[in-house]
A protein has these predicted regions:
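Active-site neighborhoods and metal-handling regions in enzymes and metal-associated proteins
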Residues: 1-405
Length: 405
């Protein structure tokens, strides 16, 4: 599985004339290697063959002192980390060459690997030669990095490897992750099912006098009891006037009769995130509140019916946004309609006016329109949806009709 993902990454990088890729975010480390530990750097040299080569027989005792061994020149896939994770790498990533950090930082090890790979690199990537067949110091690699790379690491790499160019290549790195395989879809569906169960559970808990913090904690405890490892983001419980803030912080405000309460929450199950939002009423809502709720629900449903393979993301956003505007509330829907979900809670692509990515089958994206009337109340309804060839599959199954408690 991980080798197949690296093959796709390798092909994406070849098409963009990159000679190597360096990753350090936990989600990308896991996606491309299976490593679930902490600090590490993944370095892969791009190969014109289908599969970048690695020789794990050299894992034992490999450090900066012997990193110039001849055999390193033919390896193309490395994971650099310290002694806290040696055993973990060997168990989780048996097909990756482990570089054991000891007395130097990541940038020094990357520098050595780049220098030692030069001879082999010339043959497969002649375009990387800056000056006709000169020594290795005259070579420059174009190395793809994430847009989330820590600035300190980026500066250290740039200083240690001045003859190389580190280029943000978000599209090449994230393209594979946008399309989920069957195992990923099943895991995300299970994570979302935990969220659905949490919503059903929390309804019996909600009544006047209970605080937003009480509700948020109960949701978290319930999801963890159902097998979630952690929250996928800080739970939002926004009641009364707080619900007009899309990302309100949880407070000790007590629920009151006449409140709308918006709950946006999710969990991580076996590494993958869920995300859902529901708005409920405490006591009988006003006519205006019911009207706004129905507009948001209709926008959610209209957008969902537009979801299918081959549609631009901004066109789907426009369906919901245009409908809300036609009902007179266009100024009160300020955020994008949705975002990708997977190993991270916010992934590509996005349902937003700026995103012209064309949807592909098995993308997992949220559909979450909202209307927010400052200082009064707000409504958001969010489902998690899988893009299909001729439509969609909804992973969120909680009731979306207005629930009055």
């Amino acid at each position: 599985m991980f080798q197949t993902r690296r093959q796709r990454l390798n092909q994406n990088l070849l098409e963009k004339n990159m000679q190597a890729v360096l990753l350090d975010s936990p989600s990308n480390l896991y996606y491309y290697t299976g490593f679930t530990g902490g600090e590490a750097v993944f370095l892969m040299f791009v190969s014109e063959q289908d599969t970048p080569k690695t020789d794990c027989s050299i894992n034992q005792g490999l450090d900066s002192g012997n990193a110039k061994e001849e055999q390193l020149k033919t390896n193309q896939v490395y994971l650099i980390t310290d002694s806290r994770y040696y055993e973990q790498v060997e168990k989780e990533c048996p097909d990756i060459t482990l570089i054991r950090m000891e007395n130097q930082g990541f940038s020094e090890y990357v520098k050595e690997l780049l220098e030692n790979y030069d001879d082999n690199f010339n043959e497969s990537h002649p375009q990387s030669i800056v000056s006709n067949s000169k020594k290795s110091k005259e070579l420059m690699y174009t190395i793809a990095v994430e847009d989330t790379m820590n600035l300190e690491l980026y500066l250290k790499l740039s200083n240690a490897c001045p003859d190389n160019q580190f280029v943000i290549a978000k599209d090449a790195i994230m393209e594979s992750r946008m399309i989920k395989d069957e195992a990923e879809l099943q895991t995300i569906a299970k994570a979302e099912a935990i969220g659905d169960a949490a919503f059903t559970h929390i309804l019996d808990y909600m009544k006047p006098g209970v605080t937003e913090a009480d509700i948020a904690l109960e949701i978290e405890f319930f999801m963890k009891r159902q097998g979630a490892s952690k929250l996928s983001f800080d739970t939002i419980v926004a009641s009364g006037p707080n619900s007009s803030m899309p990302h309100a912080q949880v407070t000790n405000r007590k629920l009151q009769m006449g409140d709308f309460v918006t709950m946006d929450f999710g969990c991580v199950y076996q590494g993958y995130c869920s995300d859902m939002t529901r708005t409920v009423a405490i006591g009988e809502p006003t006519e205006e509140m019911r009207k706004v709720y129905q507009i948001v629900l209709d926008a959610n449903l209209r957008a969902m019916e537009a979801i299918r393979k081959g549609v631009k993301c901004n066109e789907i956003d426009a369906v919901a946004r245009g409908y809300i505007k036609s009902q007179g509330y266009g100024d009160y829907f300020g955020h994008g309609l949705g975002h990708g979900v997977g190993l991270d809670i916010h992934e590509e692509p996005r349902f937003s006016p700026k995103c012209d990515v064309i949807t592909k089958e098995n993308m997992v994206i949220t559909d979450e329109p909202g209307i927010y009337l400052p200082g009064r109340f707000g409504v958001r309804i969010e489902d998690l949806v899988v893009v299909k060839k001729d439509g969609y599959e909804k992973l969120s199954h909680s009731d979306k009709q207005l629930i009055v408690l």
